């Protein structure tokens, strides 16, 4: 049934028709602005903007990159002037423009693609896909990511978002900033098994369900009022240890003096969490860790 739904939602998108609505421009990174697409979105039966089945990899046609960019910058000189404002060297600019005349943007540009949505609330991305390394920097609230295959990193805050049956190309789960009241249910890492939590990120009132985390290290992550019904397994010959304050201090010393004075030293914290169904494999928690 899910496969049929996925095929149906994917078939509803006419990328040739919607590409003229996309703005493409370069700031510090390459930005793909989808505001016009979301403006014209229908709503689901639940009242969400309907982005179900959207394939972010189909945003670009096979036309040369220069054709895509000149829609925004009009001519090459304007493009060169714009790139120089963002610190591009003359050599880098000329090389990029040369490649852009013979290759699509996905081959001529080697950085990360930034997706700009223009909308931040109540979007349903179920059955959507993305193959390229992309980022969404906006804060998102009450969005649905079910049965997705993504290579998206979330830089903004996530609130009330649902990730279910979610296959990711990224090594970390959720936002690399702050996560509040999000559900992570059956998260699967594609290609490799490493799936963990980004250092110095807070998860507030989140649920981690039916997921097998493969942890190489864990530093500075705060879990506040979270529920764990999942497995955490250490990746290594010896058991991985979740560090307390002293262990974290030793770790900073190993990185050099700059790491010691670069911000507060925050050990991993579990504050009022339900760990009754958390399974640990090849992983142990330092005695100094406090379960508040």
Residue ranges and their predicted role:
Residues 3-16, 20-292:
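Tandem repeat scaffolds
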């Amino acid at each position: 049934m899910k496969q049929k739904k996925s095929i149906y939602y994917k078939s509803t998108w006419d990328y040739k028709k919607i590409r003229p609505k996309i703005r493409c421009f370069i700031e510090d990174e390459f930005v793909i602005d989808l505001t016009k697409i979301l403006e014209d979105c229908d709503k689901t039966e639940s009242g969400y903007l309907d982005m179900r089945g959207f394939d972010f990899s189909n945003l670009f046609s096979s036309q040369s990159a220069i054709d895509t960019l000149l829609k925004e910058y009009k001519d090459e000189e304007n493009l060169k002037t714009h790139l120089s404002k963002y610190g591009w060297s003359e050599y880098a600019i000329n090389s990029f423009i040369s490649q852009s005349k013979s290759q699509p943007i996905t081959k001529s540009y080697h950085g990360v693609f930034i997706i700009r949505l223009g909308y931040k609330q109540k979007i349903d991305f179920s059955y959507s896909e993305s193959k390229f390394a992309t980022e969404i920097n906006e804060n998102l609230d009450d969005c649905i990511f079910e049965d997705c295959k993504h290579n998206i990193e979330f830089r903004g805050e996530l609130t009330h978002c649902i990730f279910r049956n979610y296959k990711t190309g990224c090594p970390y789960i959720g936002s690399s900033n702050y996560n509040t009241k999000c559900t992570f249910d059956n998260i699967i890492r594609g290609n490799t098994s490493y799936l963990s939590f980004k250092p110095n990120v807070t998860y507030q009132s989140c649920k981690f369900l039916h997921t097998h985390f493969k942890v190489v290290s864990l530093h500075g992550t705060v879990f506040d009022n979270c529920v764990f019904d999942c497995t955490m397994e250490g990746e290594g010959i010896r058991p991985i240890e979740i560090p307390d304050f002293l262990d974290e201090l030793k770790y900073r010393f190993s990185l050099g003096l700059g790491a010691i004075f670069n911000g507060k030293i925050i050990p991993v914290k579990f504050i009022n969490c339900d760990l009754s169904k958390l399974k640990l494999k090849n992983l142990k928690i330092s005695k100094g860790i406090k379960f508040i």
